[in-house]
Amino acid sequence: MSLSLNDIKFPSSWDLSPNDLSYIDDIYQEGLDLGVWRKDNQRDKLANENVVSLSKYFWPKVEYKKLIMGGELMLWFFTFDDAIDAGLYSDEKTAEIVKRMDRVFMDGTLPENPTGPEKVALSLRTKCKIMCGEQRKGTFNRFITSCIQWVDSIVPFNKVIANGDSPDLELYGFLRKVNIGAYPCVTLTEVMLESTLEQYIWFDPRWIKMNENIAIVVTLVNDLVSYEKEVRDKMGILNPLFFLQTKLNIELSESYKKLVDMIHHWISEYNELEERFLQLFTTDEEKKQIQFMLDHLHYLISGSRLWSMQTPRYISNTSPFIEMRKNCASLSITSFVSNCAESQRDLKKRKRV
């Protein structure tokens, strides 16, 4: 079956070209220094490139030091979340890990025997605090609060399938819009903006609702591109492209159409909210600053789709999506961590069985 991610439509003004600044090796070195990655480990180096590359799609026009901050956020997201999602820890140990990370953001200190992700979190927190200074404590607090909320969302989201059944789509979306990690990206962008805008703007219900809509769309895009990986990892129960098929007894193509229609609904509602929100601003400087934030919301969607089409984390020669199969075929055969190689090995195993 051939589906196309290009069925997802959004305004052409949301299109982007990835940031061309060189920064990935610098984040890798930082990951080595902070104990996230292992020295002389090719798998770690490739993993770093795969996950950190996302920031050049989310922040395609920022300067180097800000792109580094975006790269650190991606490094922290993936290394902290993947360890918990792997199911390596008991509930008690997981609760302790979450509490430790919360304290890093709240207090700006490291616990005893800090982990690599905890050190990355403190490094990013410190940079944000310096950039915000004394004049923008509200911005800084919004950033660290959004990070804590994301950390606290991981366990509840994973527990939503405790009864062995997929959640209702509405409940799934409500939990996932925090768990997807869009809010820390937005608040980090506010830190980068070095804004002179009044703080009350970020509490406007239209702005908050716009953020929620974007988070839901990013969630659904991520669910589409990760479909095959999650089914292969026995986690399809938490992927709506999969669980809508089983709940509604429909084919993959029909499930995909339903999700694309949902994406278009949320984008349409977002556009209407954005138009109303922009009416609040009258001066050219205000409009320029708020456009920087709006562009980032747009890039979270367009960048997520564009990155997902080419990252070895998701592409596969057996993907239901044309673009992901095509890009898998163009990968070097030596990229042994790619999903292409993984899916080929899986196919061979199934054939032997």
Swiss-Prot record:
Keywords: Lyase, Metal-binding
GO molecular function terms noted in the UniProt entry: metal ion binding; terpene synthase activity
Enzyme class: lyase
Catalytic reactions on record: (2E,6E)-farnesyl diphosphate = (2S,3R,6S,9S)-(-)-protoillud-7-ene + diphosphate
Record's keyword annotation contains ATP-binding: no
Enzyme Commission numbers on file: 4.2.3.160
Pfam families per UniProt: Terpene_syn_C_2 (PF19086)
InterPro entries: Isoprenoid_synthase_dom_sf, Terpene_cyclase-like_2
GO biological process assignments: terpene biosynthetic process
Protein task: Terpene synthase that converts its substrate farnesyl diphosphate (FPP) into the sesquiterpene protoillud-7-ene.
Comment block on domains: Contains several highly conserved motifs that are important for catalytic activity including the aspartate-rich 'DDxx(x)D/E' motif and the 'NDxxSxxxD/E' motif, both of which are involved in complexing metal ions to coordinate the binding of the isoprenyl diphosphate substrate in the active site.
PANTHER family hit by this protein: TERPENE SYNTHASE, TERPENE SYNTHASE 2-RELATED
Protein name in UniProt: Terpene synthase 1
Organism (species): Tieghemostelium lacteum (Slime mold)
